[in-house]
Amino acid sequence: MLTFVGLGLYDERSITIEGRDALANADRVFAEFYTSKLAGATTSDLEAFHDVDIEVRDRVGIERDPEPLFGAARDGSVAVLVAGDPMIATTHVDLRLRATEREIDTRVVHGTTAQTAASSLTGLQNYRFGKATTLPFAYGSGGVPESVLTTVSENRERGLHTLCYLDIEAEREAYMGADDAARRLASAFGEDERFDAGEETLAVAIARAGSPAPTVRADRLSVLSTTDFGDPLHLLVVPGDLHHVEADALEALAGAPEDLISSYRVR
């Protein structure tokens, strides 16, 4: 049996009770933290809290050489730990499909995701989010890929919000900050006629979702780009049209300037 266990968003306590039970019943426990990670816990923290030994696999060990993991799952019960929800990343869907092809039973224990947290913390309605996108580190001289701009533009044309995941390079422990993301988007929007507000576009920065003290700030990209949001992990949301409850929520929960919000309200 191969069980994918979502760890939730922040630390060793973010897992569900069902997830803890899966760990307690596993013969071996693996983990990967290159698609995402828990900002508030180390592998040692997880091992101590859950009283298990964790074998951390890198990208090669998950994507190119998963046979040791499959072999263990054929002989016993294996848990694979993943930050957030296991099946959000294509990597884990692919791993599950390959296990199924080998007639290995699989199971998924869900965890809280960044997408649900983004909606909960900002007050933006979940069903009003369009396609999400990822803003990468490695692109030209620090610019923004056309695919990202197209996603945001097409969502805005439909009045929908865009959740921007920010790049993680686990090998060098690099995590894109919301200020860096806002700076990149402000520059790109300022040069693209699809974004008439340019660097004055409304955005919402979210830092350390799932922690006891997350930060949520709504303002112009130009303002967010010069704001220190502290420790990772960060997200950035570019809102579309705002229902009056969403507009009120951004003002009350994220400190959005009233004069900026007024132009986004649905009349």
Model-found features: residue ranges?
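Class I S-adenosyl-L-methionine
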Residues: 1-105, 109
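Structural motif
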Residues: 1-3, 27-28, 53, 77-80, ...
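Residue-level signal for pocket-adjacent positions within structured domains
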Residues: 10, 127-130, 219
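Alpha-helical scaffold segments in soluble metabolic enzymes
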Residues: 45, 68, 72, 98, ...
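A short acidic, often aromatic-flanked loop/helix-cap motif at beta-alpha or helix-coil junctions
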Residues: 60-66, 114, 171-172, 210-213
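Short, surface-exposed amphipathic charged segments that create phosphate/polyanion-binding patches used
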Residues: 67-75, 120-125, 143-147, 216-223
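Class I SAM-dependent methyltransferase SAM-binding "motif I" and its flanking Rossmann-like core
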Residues: 84-161
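A contiguous loop/helix-start segment that scaffolds small-molecule binding in enzyme catalytic cores
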Residues: 156-267
